[in-house]
Amino acid sequence: DFIHQVVEGNFAAAAAVISEDSSLPSVCGRVCPQESQCEGSCILGIKSEPVAIGKLERFVGDWKLEHGAAASRTAPRNGRRVAVIGSGPAGLACASDLAKMGYGVKIFEALHKVGGVLVYGIPEFRLPKQRIVAREIAEVERLGVEIETDVIVGRTVTVDSLLGEEGYDAVFIGSGAGLPRFMGIPGENLNGVVSANEFLTRANLMRAYDDTYDTPIYVGKRVVVVGGGNVAMDAVRTAKRLGAEATIVYRRSEKELPARVEEVHHAKEEGIRFRMLTNPTAVLGDEKGWVTGLRCVEMELGEPDE
């Protein structure tokens, strides 16, 4: 396998092996939750530390990008065509695998940039856009995958038309989960309340991560992010970089945080405050409709639900 090839110093061979099963190794090596996936299944982790599979995947993926390793092998074209809706990680992985199997593949992306959550959602400090994402997408295109942006399936074209007059044999829908979920508490409509999805999209689109850009994003002096997942960590760490005093509010204890341990560790290193066992009940505002505070109640853990 690829780890054996790394041990032997055969990095080109390692890249060839990993490319057979991983379409975006440099991306996955950075942002996937390895501790609950590949590394979580490593038997060495029973008594000690598991093999750092994610870090090795990242190294091999980056080596492949830097050294221009040969593109993955593809089967002869079978004459069948598949339309892929969405250019996020699911769409890119699907398109890559199908192209390797000999299918003609075209990705339709609604927005003007390719990459989905890799470009609009995950911050630059976790996933470099030009150095990593753009080059991984170029690797997918090297397999013969076509990509068309600014196409809203359902408006510009329809699934029926893709399967009909456009001549596709199948359609893969990988449109993502872009709609946010709110808490349903009073005050959520106040100015200054935004979903993490919107905040991160604005930050990435407006290049808030680049010091040379004057980014017109409203960030208060004190920012509270409600939640404890990876998106919450991305949002709170982005707010910190934009100059805010940033705090995580989470209804359970640190042990129950769904975010990766690595992300929580980085957030603490950067000075993010954590208010655990704290649950918001209302967003407070002034007479002009702007946020002034967050009313919360203290929680305590009970027995797990059946």
Segments and roles (model prediction):
Residues 80-106, 232-240:
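N-terminal Rossmann-like FAD-binding beta1-loop-alpha1 element of flavoenzymes
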Residues 2, 26-30, 35-85, 100-101, ...:
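FAD-binding core/adjacent interface of flavoenzyme oxidoreductases
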Residues 208, 213-226, 230-246:
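Predominantly flavin-linked oxidoreductase catalytic cores and closely associated redox partners
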Residues 132-181, 198, 204-214, 241-306:
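A Rossmann-like FAD-binding core segment of flavoenzymes
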Residues 23, 88-90, 113, 229-231:
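Residue-level detector of alpha-helix initiation sites
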Residues 103-119, 247-255:
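Glycine-rich FAD pyrophosphate-binding loop
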Residues 1-29, 33:
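Long amphipathic alpha-helical segments
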Residues 121-127:
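Short glycine-enriched, charge-decorated loop/helix-capping segments at active-site entrances
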